[in-house]
Amino acid sequence: MLQVQTIPSRQDNYIWLIKQGNQAIVVDPGESAPVIERLRQQSLNLKAIFVTHHHHDHVDGVAELLALYPQCAVYGPQITLTDVPQLQTMRDQDLISFPDLDLTFTVWHTPGHTAEHIVFHGHGALFCGDTLFSGGCGRLFSGTAEQMYHSLQRLASLPEDTLVYPAHEYTYNNLSYCLQAEPDNVFTIKRIKEVSKLRQQGCPTLPSTIGIEKQSNVFLRTHMPSVAVFAQNSSELYLENEIQIFAILREKKNNL
């Protein structure tokens, strides 16, 4: 199992640090200072940076980290960091291997939040940026509802015990919306109580798991009759399929 550490960043971001011996990989460093502090505290060398998409709260720390760790490799989608010569452009199904660390990750292209968004999975963990949140999913910027629906369905196909590491602490608010759609979902009722307690203690609610998300995340539950009814009641048009249901769910969440 991977050793994954949480580095809180900005208002509600998480930078994930994968530790293997004295080497580290960080995911979506939206700022450099907390990463540098953690690396120095634990005498770690920065081996690589994983970037899921181009938004500032995911990439603003990259330049300063590379200045301190010039041998560090960067893996991300093509349009993410056009001014970073170390960037190794990742495409769907690419493999990232670190033989000296005995680590290999698979890249999936998951458009929706942005057109270029990618995720990294391996060793029972999924680093999913702003595609999948605990209880939710990312807003649609340069991607479409259809793309995001298919991206989420693809992530849902991973083993249920896969640990899910999103880039934001949105769980409580997301689950509140899920309960609007499924007020009788016993699992979600229990989950939001656990999440509330964690937040009161100042603890992260992450990682989640694919299994937890399939039982509580309304955006992975468009096949459920109660969710379809909730979406239909929010739409003036007849919803013919799960993609349309998803689109209405996302639009309604945007307006809360």
Swiss-Prot record:
Pfam families: HAGH_C (PF16123), Lactamase_B (PF00753). Its EC number is 3.1.2.6. GO terms for biological process: methylglyoxal catabolic process to D-lactate via S-lactoyl-glutathione. Zn(2+) 1 binds at H53, H55, H113, D130. Pathway: Secondary metabolite metabolism; methylglyoxal degradation; (R)-lactate from methylglyoxal: step 2/2. It is an enzyme of class 3 (hydrolase). The keyword Hydrolase applies. Binds 2 Zn(2+) ions per subunit. Keywords: Hydrolase, Metal-binding, Zinc. Zn(2+) 2 binds at D57, H58, D130, H168. It comes from the Bacteria. Monomer. This is Hydroxyacylglutathione hydrolase. It comes from Tolumonas auensis (strain DSM 9187 / NBRC 110442 / TA 4). The lineage of its organism: Bacteria, Pseudomonadati, Pseudomonadota, Gammaproteobacteria, Aeromonadales. The gene is gloB.
